[in-house]
């Protein structure tokens, strides 16, 4: 996979303010505010910044946390995991492997078959429904 390397100014020009704040500045959207939190359509969720396929809707589940949750990415190679010690916590941040967009965090409290919960900001995603 070819890395996408843009300046913050280039990202700011192509993203809306909320997308820029979360994807490029590692912000977080308010819980239960994202458009995909309750989404049930069948399809594939892509990175809003670079269009890399990230999650299949078949791996989406309702975790009750307020953000779209998935138990696995389409490919492990699509994600980079980074130790995050911000806000006095120890968590695992997940970023897009192609463009380094901040997506959210992964936690070890998800359902089978993986036991993982990828807690992802809606604003980082673009759902492409299956026909």
Swiss-Prot record:
The active site is at 119 (nucleophile). InterPro entries: Met_Sox_Rdtase_MsrB, Met_Sox_Rdtase_MsrB_dom, Mss4-like_sf. The keyword Oxidoreductase applies. Binds 1 zinc ion per subunit. The zinc ion is important for the structural integrity of the protein. Keywords: Metal-binding, Oxidoreductase, Zinc. It holds the Pfam family SelR. Zn(2+) binds at residues 47, 50, 96, 99. One of its GO terms (biological process) is response to oxidative stress. Its cofactor is Zn(2+). One of its GO terms (cellular component) is cytoplasm. It catalyses: L-methionyl-[protein] + [thioredoxin]-disulfide + H2O = L-methionyl-(R)-S-oxide-[protein] + [thioredoxin]-dithiol. It comes from the Bacteria. GO terms for molecular function: peptide-methionine (R)-S-oxide reductase activity; zinc ion binding. The keyword Metal-binding applies. Its EC number is 1.8.4.12. Residues 8-130 form the MsrB domain. Belongs to the MsrB Met sulfoxide reductase family. This is Peptide methionine sulfoxide reductase MsrB. It comes from Pseudomonas entomophila (strain L48).
């Amino acid at each position: 996979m070819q890395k996408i390397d843009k300046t913050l100014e280039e990202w700011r020009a192509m993203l809306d303010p909320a997308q820029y704040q979360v994807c490029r500045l590692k912000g977080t959207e308010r819980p239960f505010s994202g458009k995909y939190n309750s989404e049930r359509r069948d399809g594939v969720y892509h990175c809003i910044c670079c269009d890399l396929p990230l999650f299949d809707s078949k791996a989406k589940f309702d975790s009750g946390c307020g953000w779209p949750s998935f138990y696995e990415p389409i490919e492990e190679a699509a994600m980079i995991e980074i130790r995050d010690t911000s806000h006095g916590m120890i968590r695992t941040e997940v970023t897009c492997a192609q463009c380094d967009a901040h997506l959210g965090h992964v936690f070890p409290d998800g359902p089978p078959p993986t036991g993982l919960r990828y807690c992802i900001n809606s604003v980082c995603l673009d759902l492409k429904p299956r026909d």
